[in-house]
């Protein structure tokens, strides 16, 4: 019985992950919004360790829905940024990201 339940659970989890819900933010991005053309991202650089303006380059960041999968649904405090995105929805890895203050 547990085998059948686990077989049925895998597609359900894959379906839930494949359809991101833009209205339900989790982790450090709750209530955070970015300007048009930018998206919430979780970065490997803490904003306290970034340059004088508090910016990091987008290459060290992942979009929120991808980063939550790799970080077990939790972006560490101080690692949430607004990063400029390309027209196809991917991050512009050469542009600077701006920290989101909690």
From Swiss-Prot:
Glycosites: 46, 65
Intrachain S-S bonds: 34-82, 42-75, 43-61, 83-97
Induction cue: Expression is increased during sporulation. Expression is up-regulated by carbon starvation, but down-regulated by nitrogen starvation.
Signal peptide start and end residues: 1-16
Compartments, as annotated in UniProt: Secreted; Secreted, Cell wall
Domain of life the protein comes from: Eukaryota
Entry keyword Glycoprotein: yes
Tissue specificity statement from the Swiss-Prot or TrEMBL entry: Expressed in conidia and aerial hyphae.
Disruption phenotype: When the four class I hydrophobins (hcf-1 to -4) are partially silenced, approximately 10 times fewer conidia are produced an the germination efficiency of conidia is reduced by about 50%.
Transmembrane regions listed in the UniProt entry: none
Keywords for this protein: Cell wall, Conidiation, Disulfide bond, Glycoprotein, Secreted, Signal, Sporulation
Family note: Belongs to the fungal hydrophobin family.
Subunit architecture: Self-assembles to form functional amyloid fibrils called rodlets. Self-assembly into fibrillar rodlets occurs spontaneously at hydrophobic:hydrophilic interfaces and the rodlets further associate laterally to form amphipathic monolayers.
Summary of the function given for this chain in its UniProt record: Aerial growth, conidiation, and dispersal of filamentous fungi in the environment rely upon a capability of their secreting small amphipathic proteins called hydrophobins (HPBs) with low sequence identity. Class I can self-assemble into an outermost layer of rodlet bundles on aerial cell surfaces, conferring cellular hydrophobicity that supports fungal growth, development and dispersal; whereas Class II form highly ordered films at water-air interfaces through intermolecular interactions but contribute nothing to the rodlet structure.
Protein name: Class I hydrophobin 3
Organism of this sequence: Passalora fulva (Tomato leaf mold)
Gene it is expressed from: hcf-3
